[in-house]
Amino acid sequence: MIKFRLNGKIFELENDISVYDFLAQNGYELKFIALERDGEILPKKLWHEHFMSEAKDYEIVTLVGGG
């Protein structure tokens, strides 16, 4: 079992899943977010090859337009 925290909420998964697949399956609009893993931004080009990891802290950062 894989256990990690995303935006303060604990998730437990039975199987490995890529960052990309996890975010897509949970309804996030991938075009407009960034993902921070343990305090560092994980580049989108790596989302397919990196998996949600045990005991990691993730934060989703959204882009906000202004003017």
Where do the protein language model's features map onto the residues?
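Ubiquitin-like/PB1-type beta-grasp interaction modules and other compact soluble beta-rich domains
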Residues: 1-66
